[in-house]
Every structure is written in C-alpha cells, then in structure tokens.
Amino acid sequence: MIGVLLPYVRKFQRSAESNDIADRFSYQYTSTLLGFSAIMMAASQYVGRPIQCWVPAQFTRTWEKYAETYCFIKGTYFLPGAFASEGEMSVTSPDDAVTATPQVGYYQWIPIVLVLQAFLFYLPSIIWRTFNESCELKIKELAAVSEASRKIKSNMSDDQVKATKFGRYFFKKLNFRNESPVFKETGSVVASGKFLPALYLLVKILYLANIVLQFWILTYFLETKSWMWGWQTFQDLMAGREWETTGIFPRVTMCDFSIMDLTSVHDHSIQCVIVINMLAEKVYVFFWFWLLFVGLLTVCSLAYWAVIYMLQSVGRNFIYSYLQQTPEFQTEQERGSFVPANFVDKCLTPDGVFISRLVQQNSGDLFTSIMLGEMFSLYRAREAEKAHKKDDDSALPASAPVDLQEDDDDDTPFPPPTKAVAETLTSDDEEEETDVDSPDTTATLPR
C-alpha cells in the first residue's frame, strides 16, 4: 500500500506535515532547544569547572580538588544576605544558619533533567505517529505527497499534476476504507471515520498536560516558592535585585565537609562559586517564558480543533469553500446536481476533512482546491456508475427457478426451458453440427 507512493515521494524526513504549528513548537522546536541546552550544560560540567571553592591555605591541590568534587556532588547552601555588600558576610556562623538556609542541590542534575524534559515534549508525537499507523489512511505518507508537491513552484502545470495525483490516491484510500467489508464487519472506531480527529484531540490534550507538568518540574526541581518564579525573576532583574538578595540561582554558596586523620576529625566550611548557575539562570528564565508561549499556543490550537471536531457544519463549510473554486463543482451546480453534503459525509468523513485541513496548512489553498476538485469528480463518477448499475439490475427479467433435484417419479416432466435457454441450446446444436461438418485437419487423431 505504501509502495505506490515511492515513485513520486521524496524521503519523509520529518513528520511536521502531519500536525499543526502548535505541535511543532512542542515536539520539534522545544525538544531541540532543550537538547541543545542540555549539551551546553553538560559541557560546562564535565569539560570545564562547574564549581570553584576558596579553600584554606594549607590545602594542597589534591585536597582542593577533593573539596570541590565533594561540594559539587553533595550540594551547597545559600546564606541570604551574606554576600550583599562587597563580600562582607552578615552571617557570622554558618553552622548556626545552615539548617535554616535553602539547599542548592539541583545544578548537578540540570543536563539530565533537560534531556528528560525534551523527551516529555516529544512523547505525544510518538504516540500520534504510532497510533495513526493503525488507520488505513496513513497520515505520514499522505502528508509526504503533499509536501513533495509544495517543493515544485516553477511550473503551475506540475503543481496541478501533483495535486491531481494526490487527490486520486487520497480518494482511493478513502474509498477502500469506506467500502472494505473488513472495516465494516469489525465495527471498529477506524470504520466510523472519526478515528483520526479523535486521536488528534487526545494528543493535543497530552501536549497541554505536558505543559502543566513542565511548570511543576521547574517549580519542584529549582526549589522555588511559586510556579510564577520566572516572571518574578524577570521583575527582580529589571528592578536591579540580583541573586544576592533573591537567592535564585546563587553564584556564591557555602559548603561544609569533614576531613579525618589518624587522631581527629577536622570540620571545614568553605565558600564556593557555582559557575554553572550563571548559564542555568539564563537558560531557565528563557525557557519559562518559552513554555508560557507554547502553552498558550497549545490551548488555542486545542480549542480550534475541538470546535472543528464537534461542529460538523464547520468542516462542511471548509470543504465547500474550496470546492466552489473548482470547475468540477461549478459544473455540477449548473446541472442542478448539488450533492456536496453526501460528498463530505459519506466520502470524506471526519477523517478526510481532518486530513484536508492538514494538507491546506502545509501545501496551500491552490493545492487543496485542485485536490478536492479531483476527488469530487471521482466521487460523482463513482455515484453515477452505481446508479447506472442499479438501473441495469432492476431492468433484468426475473427467471423462474429450475429444480435440478432428482425425482423418483419418472412421469413428472422437466419444466419447459425459458426462451433465453432455448435459444442457447439451439445455438449450441448448430455449433456442434458445424464442428462435425468441418473438422480440424490439424488435429492428430489417436490410432
């Protein structure tokens, strides 16, 4: 089934054509953005020095490296107001304040969490592409054909040929799905013609649920007090309040550790600079606003497709607006054969209307109009053929049934043959006589 597309379809490199712009912002653009950010953060951790600590003078280089590694793995804590003025600490005893100060232990996990967030954005797309493959109308292949046609813009006739071919293929798939006894007998949701839009709405809801989950991840992972921390951080930056006051993404923190020798245990409190937080602040503040934008776009897209799915008249008007531009539809209007409602409801079904909208969004109005015009012509030709066949069947005379069962009563004669049967028998006898009079001279008779 898919192989018929290969002669005129280029390799399908991305599934962007099987959804709308809101989906692409989620699974494609946002996932790419998060993946790139994860690479940058991982490089700053494992290639550079993510944390640098001020250790006592008696520490050797090995001790210093141990202290920095320990503090990076264990985590540090921030002293509010301790570094507000020229590095003069307002807290004289970190040991007394450590239990009341916020711990900073998220920077070690930033690359891993970013990768997880990127996967969550891509997960609804995987679900969409996996389940729509169970439908006879393969969205990926149909979208690939329309995308291939969009890349040829130099010659209008080429566009028309592509749109016409796509319309024929689309109609063929719809007709097979609508007429196939396999789908009718099973009574599955695929046969109802509403599978694709229902699945698409479910995927839209998953995209929106992922946005809500992402806000929760940011709030919990960064240990902020409110999910609006992104806006609050932006306001603080505009007002000149830096991390020394707010404590969000602190650059300078404290770390406590102990070193044991042969006779005693020595406790140390050192001051560390978390270099990675400088980059993490920019990444996460930007991502918060990006997440808000994608969330609003997803809500609008979900509302748009929900209205289209629930109001059948909206889908009809969409198809009518493109059919009215085609000569095939105008010809039917002139004849008085106005049957677009049957075309939309019986031929396209909600699945076909849904795919037509995706084609329009990715290939343009002209392509969609030519495609629907070709499909409408094929539909009218098919309906005319059905009507003609029905008239022929009704015009045929009903022949009397012949009882071919053996009867023990020899006196009961066979029913007389009908006129058509008698003519057939007469012609057969004439053919036999002709064969006897004119034998085949090339035939070899057995001795």
Swiss-Prot record:
InterPro entries linked to this entry: Innexin (IPR000990)
Top-level division of the source organism's lineage: Eukaryota
Chief location bin: membrane
A GO MF label: gap junction hemi-channel activity
Compositional bias ranges of the Acidic residues kind: 426-438
Gene Ontology CC: gap junction; plasma membrane
Keywords: Cell junction, Cell membrane, Gap junction, Ion channel, Ion transport, Membrane, Transmembrane, Transmembrane helix, Transport
Residue intervals passing through the bilayer: 30-47, 108-128, 198-218, 283-303
Pfam families hit by this protein: Innexin
Membrane topology: Multi-pass membrane protein
Location of the region described as Disordered in the Swiss-Prot/TrEMBL record: 389-447
GO biological process: monoatomic ion transmembrane transport
Location in or out of the cell: Cell membrane; Cell junction, Gap junction
Family: Belongs to the pannexin family.
Described purpose of this protein according to its UniProt entry: Structural component of the gap junctions.
Name this protein carries in UniProt: Innexin-5
